[in-house]
Curated annotation (Swiss-Prot):
Keyword Amino-acid biosynthesis part of the UniProt annotation: yes
Protein's name according to its UniProt entry: Tryptophan biosynthesis protein TrpCF
GO biological process terms on file: L-tryptophan biosynthetic process
Recorded catalytic activity of this chain's protein: N-(5-phospho-beta-D-ribosyl)anthranilate = 1-(2-carboxyphenylamino)-1-deoxy-D-ribulose 5-phosphate; 1-(2-carboxyphenylamino)-1-deoxy-D-ribulose 5-phosphate + H(+) = (1S,2R)-1-C-(indol-3-yl)glycerol 3-phosphate + CO2 + H2O
Function: Bifunctional enzyme that catalyzes two sequential steps of tryptophan biosynthetic pathway. The first reaction is catalyzed by the isomerase, coded by the TrpF domain; the second reaction is catalyzed by the synthase, coded by the TrpC domain.
Record gene name: trpC
EC annotation from Swiss-Prot or TrEMBL: 4.1.1.48, 5.3.1.24
Annotated source species: Buchnera aphidicola subsp. Schizaphis graminum (strain Sg)
Length: 451
């Protein structure tokens, strides 16, 4: 029988523990352990859904995930979004280190979860000695007596426990063992495949426990769906392999949201700080919110938003010139541009600049099969009309590559967010007057979007 990855990890973990006990005997540090911890359980009760964000450099399935693994930089971003922070400490398979816990903990106020393959009481003491506030106990590698012993020690040290399960058998054990927080790992620990149906199948069977969905969470629509059946998420790999960490956290947790019609630098800064991923700069000639290139250039320089240039039936050379000079993230076509026009634009435009296409929705939806279009905008008109179209026609459609626009405001944003689009596009609904954004409305909308 072929040895599984999990079996290999556990064999090597036994060797690591033997070695660590020799170089750092428990007797040398047990009396130095501080039992004052940050309450892991309380931190998971403060928000729904909550997020346990993970510091992970490598994994057996993906290899090196994050080459530039700056723990301080990661922690200072995570602290703005996480209820707790997970730190991978396994050395051989995840390139972690027990000393990473203190590095992260000094940067944040949240509890730190030590994520490792716990099989020996020594590891629990070691984790607390290095300031972990909670540990992960996996029922796939522990029998009931081992689990009870490790969780008993954790309780003595005022540490929380995240109990991980992978199937119905382990779930029944977790309930019998009176686990307070149950993590459903969507990853098969033997072949490392991922199946979100584990969460969908197992979570309805869990009553009066805090439920965490672990592994495989990559898109905001998954969070929206699973938030109906779990309380929070543990997310690592899908964030760690991205270059712009904070932008991708916003995209994952809040959605691919955009505020369009920006004309002032101060508005762009508020939009970014509230959680938007994209900022829209309108260059269409007939728009009340048209910006000029000098202001746009300064806005882009001073903000980390992904800026989208909005054009309408304009000369291709002009679009290419503006987009490339400003290093726009994408060009949004908001007119009657046809496939031939788009083909020419794609040939002339720098490859890294994406092309989005907006549609004015009436009674039917367009086919989303255009060549060279990276994202679609469903709007109620030519933009900035403060009117919605009939959203009921979206029911049953696959909208993972669609941003919803048109008349979205503080009153209807929650309804809009449940339509399963990849994000929302705000304009007149967050304004005092055309091009002048209302900071209170923007703040309120993004507070609502963060559940």
């Amino acid at each position: 029988m072929q040895e599984t990855i999990l079996n290999k990890i556990i064999k090597d973990k036994i060797d690591w523990i033997k070695y660590r006990k020799k170089i750092q005997p428990l007797i040398k540090f047990k009396n130095k352990i501080n039992k004052e911890t940050r309450n892991f359980y309380n931190s998971l009760k403060e928000k729904r859904p909550f997020f346990i964000l993970e510091c992970k450099k490598s994994s057996p399935s993906l290899g090196i995930i994050r080459k530039k693994f700056n723990l301080i930089e990661i922690a200072n971003i995570y602290k703005n979004y996480a209820s707790a922070i997970s730190v991978l400490t396994d050395e051989k398979y995840f390139h972690g280190n027990i000393e990473y816990i203190n590095v992260v903990r000094r940067c944040v106020s949240q509890p730190i979860l030590c994520k490792d393959f716990f099989i020996d009481s020594y590891q629990v003491y070691l984790a607390r000695y290095y300031s972990a506030d909670a540990i992960l106990l996996m029922l796939s590698v522990l029998n009931d007596s081992q689990y009870l012993e490790l969780s008993r020690i954790a309780k003595e040290l005022n540490m929380g426990v995240l109990t991980e399960i992978n199937n119905i058998k382990e779930l029944k054990r977790a309930i019998k063992l009176n686990a307070s927080v149950i993590g459903i790992n969507n990853r098969n620990l033997h072949d490392l495949s991922i199946d979100l149906n584990r969460t969908r199948t197992l979570s309805p069977l869990i009553k009066n426990k805090i439920i965490v969905s672990e592994s495989g969470i990559k898109k905001n629509h998954q969070i929206k769906e699973l938030s109906n059946i779990v309380h929070g998420f543990l997310i690592g790999s899908s964030l760690m392999y991205r270059t712009n960490l904070e932008t991708n956290i916003k995209s994952l947790i809040i959605g691919d949201n955009k505020v369009c019609g920006l004309t002032r630098i101060i508005d762009a800064k508020i939009v970014e700080s509230c959680g938007a991923v994209y900022g829209g700069l309108i260059f269409a000639d007939n728009s009340l919110r048209k910006t000029n290139e000098k202001i746009a250039e300064k806005m882009i320089f001073e903000n980390n938003l992904r800026f989208i240039g909005v054009f309408q039936n304009q000369d291709i050379e002009k679009i290419v010139n503006i987009a490339q000079r400003l290093s726009l993230y994408a060009v949004q076509l908001h007119g009657s541009e046809n496939q031939k026009y788009i083909n020419i634009l794609r040939k002339k435009l720098c490859k890294k600049i994406k092309i989005w296409k907006a549609f004015s929705i009436q009674s039917t939806l367009p086919l989303l099969n255009w060549d060279h279009i990276d994202k679609y905008i469903f709007d109620s008109g030519s933009g900035g009309t403060n009117k919605t179209f009939n959203w009921s026609i979206l029911k049953g459609s696959i909208l993972e590559n669609v941003i919803l626009a048109g008349g979205i405001n503080t009153d209807n944003v929650l309804i809009a967010s449940q339509l399963n689009c990849s994000g929302l596009d705000f304009n007149s609904g967050v304004e005092k007057s055309p091009g002048i954004k209302d900071h209170k409305k923007i703040s309120l909308i993004f507070k609502k979007l963060t559940f």
